Amino acid sequence: AADAMEMLLLAILGPTLRCEWHLSHAQVAAMTTFVFIGMLLGASIWGAAADKVGRRTVLLVSTALIAYFGLLCSAAPSYAWVVTLRCFVGFNIGGGAQSYTLLTEYLPHRTRVAAIVSNLLSWCAGGIFLVLTAWVIVPTLGWRWLTALAAAPLALVLPLMLLFLPESLRYLLASGREVEAAKVMELMAKENGRPPLPGELVSQQFTDASRRGHVSQLFHSSIRRVTLTLFPIWFTIAFTYYGIILLSSDVTSFKQRCPSDNSPTRDSSIVDTSCCRNLNSQDYKSILLASTGELVILPFNLILLDRIGPCVPAWTTTAFLFLTRGCAAALFNWCYLYTAEVYPTSIRSLGIGLHSAVARVGSMLTPLVAQVLLPQVSVSLAFSTYIGLNLACCCLAISLPVETLGRAMQQSIIVDDSSTSAAASGVDEKKD
């Protein structure tokens, strides 16, 4: 939920800072892009680190740094400082993806899907809370207070993480740390009022440190096709999801746009703020309703958005954004779940981190479509871009070679040819 607040904050800050600091469309888009540059780097680095030093350590450090740089951003004196600090926030949000890794490694396959998908409720709740807070705070106290309040929940939850968040048992076993894993299991049994398990805990699939979290393992022959297929899927889903977030504040305000924004003779070095407009109550209502669309898992075709335009009632646009965002959020959850299940423990964090980094490339490019191409060039061309990429994504998803439903999560890639396929590609049908 806290990560969702930091991400949705971009949709609020863009229009607000454009008016207050007389920013151009390109500068607003650049602010979002630099956040995703930070996330691209952070997802890769934190992902590799989580396979080396542990999921819990990465989550604790990245959470503390998100709160720190988020609070600093509230005191930023200029556009350059905002961009820089939001980039650092983005870098550490890249480490937040490891929460999915830690969660999936504790869940049995029978409840894994339901638990991961229910995470969507927390993400949605964070977004809704931020919009409601912005609705009250921005018109009265300003964006700086909103930025500080968005970072506050992370600072508050950090002590709880220190006290109650355990390290992943699968990670400890894959690292050969059976003694620590046994202590975690004893603590879990005590907290749940159950007797400790008898016998000695032994890992059958130990991975040495030199291979754990190594990029080359993602391209092992048994799993290479999965890796290469997931790259464009992650890119497209992030491109669409964050595009919809940005469109939530852009599409609803077409009628109030400056005519000079679309003028072919306009000097790009001159920022026209004569009709600059901050977000009003109707805009916040639209963004709020679009945010609740993440609760809706319904099939929806983006091409319908291209049919509406600005000459129809505002509720129609909002309804389509509601449905589209619900679908995009559902696909994001599917990506995290499938990626966590298809990779073995020895490279699971790296896999999620690297694919999340590829997704940030999509997130980084989508502002150029949602905040530049759409308002300044062509609405049809912008939505055609989203439609084409999603059609290609559908074809790639159908071609994925491994079904993870009901299969055990693997601990490591076995280098022996006779057992490689069972350990890495999911032939093993043992139950959790």
Where do the PLM segments sit?
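Transmembrane-helix signature of 12-pass secondary carriers
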Residues: 1-432
